[in-house]
UniProtKB/Swiss-Prot annotation:
CDD domains: SHMT. The keyword Amino-acid biosynthesis applies. The keyword Cytoplasm applies. Pathway: One-carbon metabolism; tetrahydrofolate interconversion; Amino-acid biosynthesis; glycine biosynthesis; glycine from L-serine: step 1/1. The record marks H228 as: Plays an important role in substrate specificity. It comes from Coxiella burnetii (strain RSA 331 / Henzerling II). One of its GO terms (biological process) is glycine biosynthetic process from serine. This is Serine hydroxymethyltransferase. Homodimer. Its main location: cytoplasm. The modification N6-(pyridoxal phosphate)lysine is found at K229. Its EC number is 2.1.2.1. Catalyzes the reversible interconversion of serine and glycine with tetrahydrofolate (THF) serving as the one-carbon carrier. This reaction serves as the major source of one-carbon groups required for the biosynthesis of purines, thymidylate, methionine, and other important biomolecules. Also exhibits THF-independent aldolase activity toward beta-hydroxyamino acids, producing glycine and aldehydes, via a retro-aldol mechanism. It comes from the Bacteria.
């Protein structure tokens, strides 16, 4: 049924209700999931634009369909801005997600059965870094390094494993590591075994773009990322690289036609405007505040007796180990959720529970910083988290924190006040 004037509200009240409720949840809950953020109204607008109607297989100026002259402009803007923002020589803005960007980079760099050396999932890596349940662990032989006793990346272990297994690709990147990666050291390890060096900066891309976290783009052969999280764009992927014409051709072919068909032009346009937003001076201030808020929260939780993996944070997130608290990550996530504080359970080094239960929490500050929280609010919030974890079955404490969280959110609306 095509009716240009019919709204979702009037046509599909069930779906409209779910979206309305989700918007209320986002307004009234404190978002501490490290991979989530709030996009700008401009990004929202473009994701619902008429560009969603256009098929555009191929690349700007080399399409398989006619009528692409205007989407070519949008995609070229996204490419040029990505290259400028990240100081890259090459950018492919077509990947639909970070996982697909990784798959496409692997396709360009490896053959099935080749060896991938990456960070262990339980130490802060990602499913697509060679987990046995992921395509990356099924199609490639994955070997993993982890963290040392000090909570830092064990570079010596990585170097030893590289010499032992001679991987085709060495990957540096993470989904739950709160330190700073020594990209150059990984470059040297990769060079020692003639491996490609690939980085996944999905979590810190916004921090890298703002210059508050070291960039690997001109150190690595290939860099992948998502465009949401700290970058605050649409949920999608991006591949970057330093100059290498042969590798650029392989990357383009791996994306299209290797693993994708028609690109999502409305999402690519949203990427373009998000990249422009990240070029503004205000974005650097935002990224700096993300770090300040994360440090403030981690310090409070340490003072309250909670173990922070790696001892603290130098980016937007930190891991709380509950191994010594007789609390599971699942229990903690649920209790905090009842108080309108959204976090995610996470595996931690020395994990004894299943990935569906875990012994830790991952906490991140990109979303609360977008709302306008500063150190005062971040510290206050950390105390509330500790209040609940200190007495996790005390529903009175949970109700009290819920009321405080609701009031705090009211002072910092995401988009606008709701009924």
């Amino acid at each position: 049924m095509y009716e240009p004037t019919l709204t979702v509200e009037s046509f599909d009240s069930e779906l409209a209700g779910a979206i309305r409720d989700e918007r209320r949840r986002q307004e009234h809950h404190v978002e501490l999931i490290a991979s989530e953020n709030y996009v700008s109204p401009r990004v929202l607008e473009l994701q619902g634009s008429v560009l969603t109607n256009k098929y555009a297989e191929g690349y700007p100026g080399r399409r398989y369909y006619g009528g692409c002259e205007f989407v070519d402009i949008a995609e070229q803007l996204a490419i040029d801005r990505a290259k400028e923002l990240f100081v890259a020589d090459y950018a492919n803005v077509q990947p639909h997600s970070g996982s697909q960007a990784n798959a496409e980079a692997y396709m360009a760099l490896m053959n099935p059965g080749d060896t991938l050396l990456a960070m262990d999932l339980s130490h802060g890596g990602h499913l697509t870094h060679g987990s046995p349940v992921s395509f990356s662990g099924k199609f490639y032989k994955a070997v993993h390094y982890g963290l040392n006793a000090h909570g830092d990346i064990d570079y010596e272990q990585a170097a030893q494993l590289a010499q032992e297994h001679k991987p085709k690709v060495i990957l540096a990147g993470f989904s739950a590591f709160s330190g700073i990666v020594d990209w150059q050291r990984f470059r040297e390890i990769a060079d020692s075994v003639n491996a490609y060096f690939m980085t996944d900066i999905a979590h810190v891309a916004g921090l890298v773009a703002a210059g508050v976290y070291p960039s690997p783009v001109q150190i690595a052969d290939v860099t992948t990322t998502t465009t949401h999280k700290t970058l605050r764009g649409p949920r999608a992927g991006l591949i970057l690289a330093k100059a290498n014409p042969e590798l650029e051709k392989r990357l383009n072919s791996a994306v299209f036609p290797g693993s994708q068909g028609g690109p999502l032009m409305h999402i690519i346009a949203a990427k373009a405007v998000a990249f422009k937003e990240a070029m503004q001076p205000e974005f650097k201030t935002y990224a700096q505040q993300i770090l300040k808020n994360a440090k403030a929260m981690a310090e409070v939780m340490k003072e309250r007796g909670y173990t922070i993996v790696s001892g603290g944070t130098q980016n937007h997130l930190f891991l709380v180990s509950l191994l010594d608290k007789n609390i599971s990550g699942k229990e903690a996530e649920a209790a905090l959720g009842r108080a309108n504080i959204t976090v995610n359970k996470n595996t931690v080094p020395g994990e004894t529970r299943s990935p569906f239960v875990t012994s830790g929490l991952r906490i991140g500050t990109p979303a609360i910083t977008t709302r306008g929280f500063k150190e005062k609010e971040a510290s206050q919030l950390a105390h509330w988290v500790c209040d609940i974890l200190d007495d996790i079955h005390n529903e009175k404490v949970i109700a009290d924190v819920k009321q405080k969280a609701h009031e705090l959110c009211g002072k910092f609306p995401v988009y606008q006040e709701l009924d």
